[in-house]
Amino acid sequence: MTEGGARGPAGPRGDTAAPAGRSSSLAPQADTLFAYGTLQFGPVLEELLGRVPEADLGVARDRRVAALPKRAYPGLVAEPGRMACGLVLQGLTPADWEIIDAFEDEQYELRSVRVMGWEEPVPTFVWTDVVAERDWHPEEFAADHLHGYTALCARWRAEFGRRTR
């Protein structure tokens, strides 16, 4: 989704780019987000947003969910012929976007991508730095990192709340 990094827990063609650094014009206008990484997990969303938004399955063509060096979370990159599976989170509020935007690592850029079954492009965070050759797998993340990552999210969210009061 997001997918949470240096500012959050650390452990393409055809896209509509939005400037990194954020609160871009894409986010306030959208109530959806294509989440392909850690933001697919209810416990992570619960810690960050205080709720789990409604979601539908989503697939972005010509994209790959890549593992990132020395990180538990992934990055979405362009790769012809591949398909990236995730969730389209729905009903996001401006307050949700503020949290998600602050949470995401600076190497992500908010862009709109085509998601199968969705008429309009859906915002997502694409990775702009080096990726591993291997794919990121949510089931591996769930087994190996979810518990600790969720605890990091809780600490990050508490600190974010103190900074934004």
Segments predicted by a language model, with ranges:
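Glycine-aromatic micro-motifs
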Residues: 2-165
